[in-house]
């Protein structure tokens, strides 16, 4: 897949990354090579491969969930923490919108 300078500029703009023309020129072939490699991965026959989430099996010991389980604070400090935030809504931190 071929990526041109304008495509790199658009991606950089969406990611809020400032790039010079020289950086855009350098990045276009690099992104093209990465996407070509991803296309090659898509061509690999994986029909006989068992799906997995990790190479090494993950066996984690589980515990019961406990409300207010924080040993340092005893829990129940959400309101105190949110009181220091510039914006909060429905028990969550409020942040400015960054997606256009």
Swiss-Prot record:
Catalytic activity: L-glutamyl-tRNA(Gln) + L-glutamine + ATP + H2O = L-glutaminyl-tRNA(Gln) + L-glutamate + ADP + phosphate + H(+); L-aspartyl-tRNA(Asn) + L-glutamine + ATP + H2O = L-asparaginyl-tRNA(Asn) + L-glutamate + ADP + phosphate + 2 H(+)
MF terms (GO), sorted A to Z: asparaginyl-tRNA synthase (glutamine-hydrolyzing) activity; ATP binding; glutaminyl-tRNA synthase (glutamine-hydrolyzing) activity
UniProt keyword Metal-binding present: no
Pfam family, one: GatC
Domain of life: Bacteria
E.C. numbers: 6.3.5.-
Alphabetical keyword list: ATP-binding, Ligase, Nucleotide-binding, Protein biosynthesis
Family: Belongs to the GatC family.
Protein's recorded name: Aspartyl/glutamyl-tRNA(Asn/Gln) amidotransferase subunit C
Species of provenance: Erythrobacter litoralis (strain HTCC2594)
Gene: gatC
């Amino acid at each position: 897949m071929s990526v041109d300078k304008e495509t790199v500029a658009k991606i950089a703009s969406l990611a809020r990354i400032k790039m010079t023309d020289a950086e855009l020129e350098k990045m276009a072939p690099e992104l093209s090579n990465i996407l070509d490699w991803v296309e090659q991965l898509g061509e690999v026959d994986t029909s006989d491969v068992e799906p997995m989430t990790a190479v090494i099996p993950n066996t984690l010991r589980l515990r019961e969930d406990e409300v207010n389980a924080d040993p340092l604070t005893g829990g129940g400090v959400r309101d105190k923490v949110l009181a220091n935030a510039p914006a909060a809504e429905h028990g969550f931190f409020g942040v400015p919108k960054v997606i256009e």
